[in-house]
From Swiss-Prot:
Main EC class the enzyme belongs to: lyase
Biological role: Catalyzes the conversion of (8S)-3',8-cyclo-7,8-dihydroguanosine 5'-triphosphate to cyclic pyranopterin monophosphate (cPMP).
Annotated protein name in UniProt: Cyclic pyranopterin monophosphate synthase
Family membership noted in the UniProt record: Belongs to the MoaC family.
Keyword Lyase attached: yes
Record-level GO BP terms: Mo-molybdopterin cofactor biosynthetic process
InterPro entries: MoaC (IPR023045), MoaC_bact/euk (IPR047594), MoaC_sf (IPR036522), MoCo_biosynth_MoaA/MoaC (IPR050105), Mopterin_CF_biosynth-C_dom (IPR002820)
Chemical reaction(s) catalysed: (8S)-3',8-cyclo-7,8-dihydroguanosine 5'-triphosphate = cyclic pyranopterin phosphate + diphosphate
Pathway(s) annotated for this protein in UniProt: Cofactor biosynthesis; molybdopterin biosynthesis
């Protein structure tokens, strides 16, 4: 099993030194889902939520989440992101909203945390905007789907 990189020899947390790593194109894709009542889904689909355009605001929140990851996750490096693409899919069969985020940079460390944070913040925004009508919404299945670039190469979830 690989070693955990965020701990020194004494077991103390530290920020990993990426200064000696080569700069490469880094891409990560993450996704997640928020399940809800059918009536809540319809409010979102029709654009009738009292707080406004749920998907539009959640998209901006997800982008902001990716950009602010280093402020939220203590040992993440602040990164100059070159792209954050956020897609929402409305799924009336569940009913749910699926969020998929692709984050890119050209740098020395990956962007998996930025993609995961973006998905979570986007879905949390959906919850915030709809909680008055559905406190039982559930955020689920948040995970990295793929990553590309860096020393460890490409990885795609099964």
């Amino acid at each position: 099993m690989p070693e955990l990189t965020h701990f020194d020899a004494a077991g103390q947390a530290h920020m990993v030194d990426v200064g000696g790593k080569a700069e490469t194109k880094r891409i990560a894709v993450a996704r997640g889902t928020i399940r809800m009542l059918p009536a809540t889904f319809e409010l979102i689909r029709k654009g009738e939520a009292k707080k406004g355009d749920v998907i539009g605001i959640a998209r901006i929140a997800a982008i902001q989440g990716a950009k602010r990851t280093a402020d939220l996750i203590p040992l993440c490096h602040p990164l100059a992101l070159t792209r954050v693409a956020v897609d929402f899919e409305l799924d009336e069969t569940v009913p749910a909203v699926h969020c998929r985020v692709q984050v890119e940079t050209h740098g020395r460390t990956g962007v998996e945390m930025e993609a995961l944070t973006a998905v979570q913040v986007g879905l949390l925004t959906v919850y915030d905007m709809c909680k008055a009508v559905d406190r039982g919404m559930t955020i689920t299945d948040v995970k990295v789907m793929e990553k590309h670039g860096g020393k460890s190469g490409d990885w795609v979830a099964e």
